[in-house]
Curated annotation (Swiss-Prot):
One of its GO terms (molecular function) is transferase activity. Pathway: Protein modification; protein ubiquitination. Residues 34-49, 330-349, 379-397 have a biased composition (Basic and acidic residues). InterPro entries: MARCH10_RING_CH-C4HC3, RING-CH-type_E3_ubiq-ligase, Znf_RING-CH, Znf_RING/FYVE/PHD. It comes from Homo sapiens. E3 ubiquitin-protein ligase. E3 ubiquitin ligases accept ubiquitin from an E2 ubiquitin-conjugating enzyme in the form of a thioester and then directly transfer the ubiquitin to targeted substrates. GO terms for biological process: protein ubiquitination. Zn(2+) 1 binds at residues 659, 662, 687, 690. The RING-CH-type zinc finger domain is required for E3 ligase activity. Its EC number is 2.3.2.27. Residues 237-249 have a biased composition (Polar residues). A zinc finger (RING-CH-type) spans 651-721. This is Probable E3 ubiquitin-protein ligase MARCHF10. CDD domains: RING_CH-C4HC3_MARCH10 (cd16813).
Amino acid sequence: MLHDARDRQKFFSDVQYLRDMQHKVDSEYQACLRRQEYRRDPNEKKRDQFWGQETSFERSRFSSRSSSKQSSSEEDALTEPRSSIKISAFKCDSKLPAIDQTSVKQKHKSTMTVRKAEKVDPSEPSPADQAPMVLLRKRKPNLRRFTVSPESHSPRASGDRSRQKQQWPAKVPVPRGADQVVQQEGLMCNTKLKRPNQERRNLVPSSQPMTENAPDRAKKGDPSAPSQSELHPALSQAFQGKNSPQVLSEFSGPPLTPTTVGGPRKASFRFRDEDFYSILSLNSRRESDDTEEETQSEECLWVGVRSPCSPSHHKRSRFGGTSTPQAKNKNFEENAENCRGHSSRRSEPSHGSLRISNAMEPATERPSAGQRLSQDPGLPDRESATEKDRGGSENAKKSPLSWDTKSEPRQEVGVNAENVWSDCISVEHRPGTHDSEGYWKDYLNSSQNSLDYFISGRPISPRSSVNSSYNPPASFMHSALRDDIPVDLSMSSTSVHSSDSEGNSGFHVCQPLSPIRNRTPFASAENHNYFPVNSAHEFAVREAEDTTLTSQPQGAPLYTDLLLNPQGNLSLVDSSSSSPSRMNSEGHLHVSGSLQENTPFTFFAVSHFPNQNDNGSRMAASGFTDEKETSKIKADPEKLKKLQESLLEEDSEEEGDLCRICQIAGGSPSNPLLEPCGCVGSLQFVHQECLKKWLKVKITSGADLGAVKTCEMCKQGLLVDLGDFNMIEFYQKHQQSQAQNELMNSGLYLVLLLHLYEQRFAELMRLNHNQVERERLSRNYPQPRTEENENSELGDGNEGSISQSQVV
């Protein structure tokens, strides 16, 4: 009972302890949740405050647009960078991701380098100003919203602007997917970018002549300067999502500002000056303490995060690198349908007159050695500034390594500057430690930037640069063949740019293509983009497969030699390991002047074109050899059988009859060969002594009498009389001896067990007797007896010491 009560009490105490522990853990968890909510609430309040302040500032800034336009352009050009600097300083960095925080050393280095560059020569544009790729974060209020109407640049009444202001506060979130940032309602182009927690950036190209001309135009009082400074925030809009390849270059460069050709009602909206990039470069210089460090960290993250070969890159060059979205549809109207058509996969070409480039101007300046990127000079025609800036910014965002082609101007009369080829970015070798970063960027571009109608493959060399007046650096890469991507002539591979006396620049590219899967003989890339060629020229696509007779693995690279010139001749030589013959296939695409304006060209890139005749001959040869081999195989078994029979005959003649147990031929009178069962062949004969031993072994192993009398092979009874050996008697004796052994073993076991019991019983009795004695002694003699015994022992010790002293 006592034990049960104790166990019950212990159980209850354990349960209570567990409940207490659970309650304690729950209380701690609740306290932790409350602390997190307490921390979250102030952050949300701060964020709401910042958003409210930004919204109020944006509204005040856009509401004061009419008054600011009446003021001088010099004041606007000065106040706009100052306001952007103030807002960027006012904006806190709490919303930045933790991965963008760089070390103090990197910050110090970046700020010192920028300041030194500014102190060297203030009159000359520094390399930081000349660098076209400026990484901007989406945390500046002046880069947040952008509302543009073509009517805002025309002298209209203030009522129209007030009507636009009423439409302004409606927030339009940035869509993802095919429909892009721009949503137009009538004559209004209103884009709204929410502030995401993820990392956003945009590569903004800035051109040297624009940067140099900015102060001059501001002094002259050009009324377009403030408008450009107000329009440049939309340049830096980016999409939501963190490093997503699908939104890499969805919207690059200036906003989709519709350029109308006809219609008296609709005023054409265009950038009337090229120096709106200069204000952006000035802002980047003044905010170098804040943006340069982020630029370095974001470039590192950009190189590390981007996957080289991602299948989801098929949407990254939506607007095209070297040509603009308005190359397909230049005369689109200012409504949502055409604007979305440009934003989505492809837009229907208009039937108006297409303004193809006559503005392929040679560059006025070459980039310096320390300069990372430079852009071609702006176009003299102001109406083409939108297309130019769009193409340049797209190229800068698409790839740090692009191609800067400077060719002769076209001679068409009614064409407008589209800057399809000249508005690209050239890259030179950076000295010293910057080469490694260039290699990384090259390798990155090899997986991103593409001539999108060719088949994907990895580059041979990460970098190639040829610097001359007609030999700019050209980087090529073959990307996956897709039908919804414009032609991007900036590719990464080993390329050599050559030019002849007539000005036809050609590019010779050695590019590997990996045959990942069996491709169709003719893979066409439809609706890519217009090629800047004359209407009378033709496209010739030549494909020759040159292989060797040696077999190669399936993943062998296909080296493609691409010869490309601006006159429209395209020759493709593709060597693969599919067939051992040479084959030339030519496809000519004749393009007239009217078709050139409205119909996109279809390019054929043939990378795998097997020769069926050669395959058939090879199959026939292989079938012939297979027949020969099968005939040989049929003849071989007959020879083997003959050899085996001859060997068996020789063995039987030499050795004679063998005992199946000891494998010894012949017998003796004392040990003859017997036939105990119905076995034949090599198992027919057994020696007498061998059979006796075998039967004894079977009996002693514990087999039954029936198993002993039966042959293991033929399952027949052994009909032998071994004379002195009686199998039944031996079996009975073995059984008796076995029983006796078992009995003896059991008796011995019992004796040993009884002995152990006796020892255990004696030990228990002794322990019990000792316990009884102790209890009896404890009852007779109480506890203090032990203390008295100790005292008496001490007294005896003292008496002994005294007696010893007396004896001495």
